Every structure is written in structure tokens, then in C-alpha cells.
Amino acid sequence: YYAQHDMKSSNNTFNFYDFVISFPVYKSLAMYAGVTPYSDVGYEMTSKITDPAIISSTGVITNTVQGYGGMTNIFLGAGYEVIKGLSVGVEGQYYFGNLHKTNDFVMTNSTYRSISSGFNMNLDAVTARFGVQYETRLTQGLSAVIGATYRLGTSLKGKVERYEIQSISSINDSTPSPRNYTDTLGRGQVKLASELGVGIALKGGGKWTAEINYIRSDWSSSGMNKIPGFASVGNAVFSASTAQSVRAGFSIVPNRNDIRYYSK
């Protein structure tokens, strides 16, 4: 809530980043479901054109480029222990979300048209992930876990709306009507890349765990560098390529039977 003199404003918002629930189905079978962010877009850049040769007639030109939105992943999966220590799993995934990109040119001279253009994208996709995991005891109280996952590449579907609005303050009757068109993404035009992940963990009984994971996705054939709304505009150069990440982590629970552990 914000208030200053006779101005008042209030805003309520709610958001969450990760939510997962798991439950046993049978002695060797368990299921889980959850929701997590997949991608986020959030940027805003402003520049001014001050070249005297240009602004002598147009006035200072302000260019603002902005992008916002994101995609969310809803998933449902199951894991099954085939034999002692060896487990396999499968996960269904649904991606959905909206992305918005705007490009505004504002003229200070009211006899020139200001232009606002951009893209509104409503996107979704369905895919699946498969995994395998093996756990073996190394010594008394120490075990190792090795695992791998693979997510299938899939076509990104939805609609991409391109719009352009021109405005002028001094000659209202000469302002062109807003222009826009909507393109339905055909199958295979844009793809979400497949993903390969491998990892290894060491577990010290029920007290501590240390792990390292490697994930690789090849986006070079995703088509995003060719389709309007995804591809770069103007002289900027964009080319989708391979994304790789290495992640490591460590956790410790000194006393798993402590009542404070169950109250977390």
C-alpha cells in the first residue's frame, strides 16, 4: 500500500516458485506431482538518440525496449524399484505461459509519429522425461547413487501476435489504424530442446548427502533464431546454441530423529 497527499495505491500479489508432493502407491512404487517455473523474461532498456543531424527536426527520440513473462512446468511422475538398488521413472510434463516484448520510439516533437510495436506470445508444449537410478553401498554407513535422465524434445505450440501502433498528438486525423497479425505456430516451427542429465551422489547414512549433476541441452535446431517473436530484430545477432550446467550441493541433518527435524 502507498499513499502520498491525495494519491493512494495498493497492490496485492501472490506467487510461488516450486511445489512438489510425493506419496507411496505400493511397496516398490511411488508417485509425485508438482509445478515449477521453466523460464522467465524480464528486461527493460532505454536509450536516447541525440545526434544533432537527426533531432534538429524530430526532437530527442527515446527508445525503450521491454520484455516480461515466463513459462511454467506442471509435471506428474512415478518411480518403480525394479530390483534392490535399481529404480526407473517416467514423468509427464506440460509447459504453458505468456511472453510479451515491446519496442517503443517516442518523439518529443509532436508533429512526428511515435511508434509502439511488439509481440504477445501464448505458448504451450507437452513432453516426457525418463530416468534411471542405481544405489550401492560402498562401506558401512556410506553409499553411492548414480542416475541419469533424458527429456524428449518437443514442438512448441501456440500463437504469436505482432502489433504496431502509431500515435501523433498534433494531427489526430492522420494517425494510421493499429496494425496487427496473429501467426499460429505450426508443428515443428519452434521446438523445446531435448535434455540429458547425469549425476552422482554420496550418502552418509541418513545424516548427510553430497552430489554433483551435469545437464546438457542442444538448442541449435530449435528454430528460435528464425521465427518472429523469438528471433532478434535489427542488427542484433542471435543464434540458439548448446546450454550446459554443472551443479553441486551438500545437505546435512545431524539428528534425523530430533523433534525439530519433523517440525520443519
Where on the chain are the PLM-derived regions?
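Surface-exposed strand-loop-strand hairpins of Gram-negative outer-membrane beta-barrel proteins
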Residues: Y1-T13
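Outer-membrane beta-barrel porins/channels
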Residues: F16, P24-K264
